[in-house]
Amino acid sequence: CLVGSEMCIRDSHKEGAAASIQIGHCGNMTHYSTAGQIPIGASSGFNLYAYTPVRKMRRDEIMQVSKDFGKAVRTAHAAGFDCVEVHAGHGYLISQFLSPYTNHRRDEYGGSLDNRMRFMRMCLEEVMNAAAATGTSVLVKHNMYDGFKGGIEIPESIEIAREIERWKVNGIVLSGGFVSKAPMAVMRGLIPIYTMSYYSPLWLRAFIRYCGPFMIRQFPFSECYFLEDAKKFREALQLPLIYVGGLVSREGIERALDSGFELVQMARALVNDPAFVNKLREGDAATRSECDHRNYCIARMYSVDMKCCKHCGDLPRKIREELAKLP
């Protein structure tokens, strides 16, 4: 089972909450050191995220990985989770098959949108079969758009969402952005380049500091930054939809719920203040997260633990100086 998850699940159930876990495959964003081999993806190429070549998946590997999604559901259920969230966005493996930016295949898994959805359908079939056998709920995280020219745009994404809906999943989490190409389209806000380089391997630091500002497009933060685009999906779909993206206040959450979304997700607001939801529950209409979206937590999360800079008493001097300069 999943070592270390028992306490989290037990405490969630004790408080009356269901426990969900995200399942997915990084594909071409997998680090060589993690995989122990050249990473696989929808197509061959080079992974700028982990600085390693990528090998196109064979048909037998596609079949095996899709079955592994079903195994992941059964593993999650055995560990005590009530729900799984299939990650089909942000440029991870399912998203790599869906996006024309990363899918250059000339077989039945590439080309037309129907072909590019084939791997996703295979994964969902395995997931839904395992979910039916175990009584596990299923959510799917889905990209509304990739965030750059040549990627998935909203009209095509709505067709993908309709296909997901046909599999009778319990809900879709609407997101956007592509970590290996447009990471800040996912998260928005400031880009702490020095902090990113500080927590990277020594050989990589200079590249990030000097090339990072030119490679990473900035997307300004605004509260509920995905909401207007997400409303287009609300109009097109019947299943429950979950809004995520820039929720930092009671007013923002109410805007999302009043727009027809059944549930909301938050991340950085809770990294900043784990008690944020309880404060909302206490009824203070002015409750607002103190997260300032300087994204220190994002800059360090792939190298060390994810932590808000406001809770780090041992920040290195140069990182403190960088954060102080950010508006």
Can you annotate each of these PLM segments?
Residues 280-327:
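Cysteine-cluster motifs in flexible loop/terminal segments that predominantly coordinate metals
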